[in-house]
Amino acid sequence: MGSAFVFLEASLELIPQKIRGHPAVRADAIRRGKRPEKILLDDSKHHTAMKSLEFREKRGRPDIVHQCLLLLLDSPLRDFEVYVHTLNGEIIWVNRETRLPRNYNRFVGLMEKLFEERRITAGDTTLIEFKDVGLRDIVRGRDVLLFREKGGRFEFSELLDGDVAVCIGAFPHGDFFEETLRELGEFKEVSLGTESYTSLYVTSRVLCEYERVRAHKVG
């Protein structure tokens, strides 16, 4: 089966219906020549419109998962899968051979195309696609490690030795939804320290340890 890195509740969604008529959204849509419902929600552009949204503090930050994915896909190791679980509960699979745009605006365009077509391909190869599965399905059979501020401290050599699902939040503020925690089933809460860390920092630390443990195991 192998391991998997799963970015939980990623701030990755199209403009919700509730704010599609807001002046800030309409101005952005006109500027880009796209309909509001085809545009990715982005706090830097739609901040004033987002004030009325539920769980507003967790939304509109596609840059978080963009940075984390770039880091993961740069890893020379190929023994883990990569998934994105969105704030709306959808599952995106990312081919390890995918070369994501490093430019943020190009990444946004790619994600908007993904939401519209549900799959990105190059020739006969699927690079990124929405999967018709739930979070429970992609972690099944793996030891689930949930990185969380209030988790425990463990030795990475023990944690990362088998088939694991490394679960990292990909939203700016707040905590995981109870529904997400239920979907994970049995999991171990892991903390890197007493402070609150960014998703990118957590991904970097865990990936570094994962590569160290796996390289030692192979050697």
Swiss-Prot record:
GO aspect biological process, one term: rRNA base methylation
Coiled-coil regions, chain positions: none
Keyword Methyltransferase in annotation: yes
Site (Stabilizes Arg-61) residue list: D63
Molecular function GO terms recorded: rRNA (pseudouridine) methyltransferase activity; rRNA binding
Site (Interaction with substrate rRNA): R61, R99, R102, R106
CDD domains the UniProt entry points to: Nep1-like
Record EC number: 2.1.1.-
Keyword rRNA-binding among UniProt keywords: yes
UniProt entry keywords in alphabetical sequence: Methyltransferase, Ribosome biogenesis, RNA-binding, rRNA processing, rRNA-binding, S-adenosyl-L-methionine, Transferase
Catalytic activity entry: a pseudouridine in rRNA + S-adenosyl-L-methionine = an N(1)-methylpseudouridine in rRNA + S-adenosyl-L-homocysteine + H(+)
Database matches in InterPro entries: Alpha/beta_knot_MTases, Rbsml_bgen_MeTrfase_EMG1/NEP1, Ribosome_NEP1_arc, tRNA_m1G_MTases_N
Binding residue positions for S-adenosyl-L-methionine: F147, G169, G174, L192, G193, T194, E195, S196, Y197
Family annotation (PANTHER family): NEP1/MRA1 (PTHR12636), RIBOSOMAL RNA SMALL SUBUNIT METHYLTRANSFERASE NEP1 (PTHR12636:SF5)
Role played: Methyltransferase involved in ribosomal biogenesis. Specifically catalyzes the N1-methylation of the pseudouridine corresponding to position 914 in M.jannaschii 16S rRNA.
Self-association state and partner proteins as the record states: Homodimer.
Matches recorded under NCBIfam families: PRK04171.2-4
Record family assignment: Belongs to the class IV-like SAM-binding methyltransferase superfamily. RNA methyltransferase NEP1 family.
Protein name: Ribosomal RNA small subunit methyltransferase Nep1
